[in-house]
Amino acid sequence: MNFLGVINPVALQLGPFQIRWYGIIIASAVILAVYLSVLEGRKQNILDDDIYDLLLYSLPVAIICARIYYVVFEWSYYSHHLSETYRIWDGGIAIYGALIGAVIVILIFCRRRNIPTWTLLDVIAPTVILAQGIGRWGNFMNQEAHGVATTLGFLKSLHLPKFIINQMYIDGTYYQPTFLYESLWDISGFVVLIILRRQKKLLKSGEVVLSYIIWYSFGRFFIEGMRTDSLMLGSLRVSQWLSLILFISAIAAIFYRRYNDPLLKWYTE
């Protein structure tokens, strides 16, 4: 931490190599998510090794897809800087791209391992949103994914800790801590999903992950509107369009599945 109170994004320097807080936080979030998924997976007769293998396959694909998603919607820049398209360490990944990549891997993985897809998605959904909430603190360390400019007075009115206020002071301007808004929303979503999942005869198979989509996309739509660094598509940001589509689709899927399959089993069965 420097004399202005801004946290150094580099946690440890080993010669020419840097270990950044962002990586530490993301890795910790993934480890916690895997641990909790293993515990829940045992209740649903999913082998521990299946969870570990899924992570091994899905993580690199998710990272690649997150980068591709970002580059595609910033093609006006990267079309003139092709050599930078792979420089992921310079920043520029999108969570929705990562989720799309992970879902593709899950669909293939479940088919090959003969695992019920909806069951596996229900198992990991709450831990994914928890990891997302924790991961936003990596953005905090990098002073990125913040919102529009604001005032010191406004930040103080939120009764935020001083270290958060200091970190939101970037190049002479204070910014909205949208990372914090999303982190709190995601962690709250984790709690809600766990409570709902534990209720008997409340959620059908597949409705835990659909509830995750509804919760996350609803919050992301509004929080994304406060961002200044996200990708635009017309009058809305790309993530807002996708959030809107996912929100409506998940609600429709719940009604469609219940209407067309009255024998659909409860998650707790």
UniProtKB/Swiss-Prot annotation:
Its EC number is 2.5.1.145. It is a multi-pass membrane protein. Keywords: Cell membrane, Membrane, Transferase, Transmembrane, Transmembrane helix. A 1,2-diacyl-sn-glycero-3-phospho-(1'-sn-glycerol) binds at residue 136. One of its GO terms (biological process) is lipoprotein biosynthetic process. It is an enzyme of class 2 (transferase). The keyword Transmembrane helix applies. GO terms for molecular function: phosphatidylglycerol-prolipoprotein diacylglyceryl transferase activity. One of its GO terms (cellular component) is plasma membrane. The chain crosses the membrane at residues 21-41, 54-74, 88-108, 206-226, 236-256. It is found in: Cell membrane. Pathway: Protein modification; lipoprotein biosynthesis (diacylglyceryl transfer). Catalyzes the transfer of the diacylglyceryl group from phosphatidylglycerol to the sulfhydryl group of the N-terminal cysteine of a prolipoprotein, the first step in the formation of mature lipoproteins. NCBIfam families: lgt (TIGR00544). Belongs to the Lgt family. This is Phosphatidylglycerol--prolipoprotein diacylglyceryl transferase. It comes from Ligilactobacillus salivarius (strain UCC118). The gene is lgt.
